[in-house]
Curated annotation (Swiss-Prot):
Entry protein name: Uridylate kinase
Positions of UMP binding: 54, 74, 135-142
HAMAP family found in the cross-reference section: PyrH_B
Keyword Kinase: yes
Positions that bind ATP: 12-15, 55, 59, 163, 169, 172
Pathway recorded for this protein: Pyrimidine metabolism; CTP biosynthesis via de novo pathway; UDP from UMP (UMPK route): step 1/1
Length: 241
């Protein structure tokens, strides 16, 4: 059997990916598929932390653009990420995968508060940990949350699970047929080429802590396992400069 390349991962799942073709809400079939994909990697002994976005329900930036106070709008977005996390927890536990949800905003009736050392212990015991509520602070994206949690738990990689996009391109491949797919980039490449993979705060955190990223299509069965095993199916963004 091939060697596992990444033994402790942060899987960043966008809210849009959970919505499926509808674009909004939570698609139970998508949850089921994603849970099965995660289980296949969990069964290999990989330690898995997950950060969900909330864009399938609400975006703080959109609310702010409509006249809401930005902090208030962002808190609503944080709650959306927790709803997504609970749905994914249910999908995983239906398959027998022990899963804990930890939130940066306390709501003890439904989830544990985020405690780094407790999260590490869960991972060591073979439990999947879903980090909900973003960083707990407005003005920070869930991409930044993924980079922050990856640094805190000493993850080997951040897997950027994309909805139907199989990597990073020089332009939108749906619009530009000549768009070039990159197999490998650095964090500085993202800035110099203006490639919208993650926001600058998340990118800086990843670069400063030397955490690589892999951008890949999560919709294709087996892709999470392929990435964990080191197959070149997406775009690798090296953690260094």
């Amino acid at each position: 059997m091939s060697q596992i390349k990444y033994k402790r991962i942060i899987l960043k799942v966008s809210g849009e990916a959970l919505a499926g073709e509808k674009g909004t809400g939570i698609n139970p079939e998508v949850i089921k598929h994603l849970a099965e994909e995660i289980k296949s990697v969990h069964d290999m002994g990989v330690e898995i932390g997950i950060v969900c976005g909330g864009g399938n329900m609400w975006r703080g930036e959109t609310g702010a653009n409509l006249g809401m106070e930005r902090a208030q709008a962002d808190y609503m977005g944080m709650l959306a990420t927790i709803m997504n996390g609970l749905a994914l927890q249910d999908g995983l536990e239906n398959l027998g995968v022990p899963t804990r949800v930890q939130t940066s905003i306390e709501m003890r009736q439904i989830a544990e508060p985020y405690i780094r050392r407790k999260a590490m212990r869960h991972l060591e015991k073979g439990r999947v940990v879903i980090f909900g509520g973003g960083t707990g602070n407005p003005y920070f994206s869930t991409d930044t949350t993924a980079a922050l949690r990856a640094a805190e738990i000493d993850a080997d990689v951040i897997l950027m699970a994309k909805n139907g996009v199989d990597g990073v391109y020089s332009a939108d491949p749906k619009v530009d047929p000549n768009a070039k797919k990159y197999s490998e980039l650095t964090q500085l490449d993202l800035i110099s080429k203006n490639l919208k993979v993650m926001d600058s705060t998340a990118s800086s955190l990843s670069m400063d802590n030397n955490i690589p990223l892999v951008v890949f299509n999560v919709n294709k069965p087996g892709n999470i396992k392929k990435v964990v095993m080191g197959e070149n199916i997406g775009t690798v963004i090296k953690g260094d400069k």
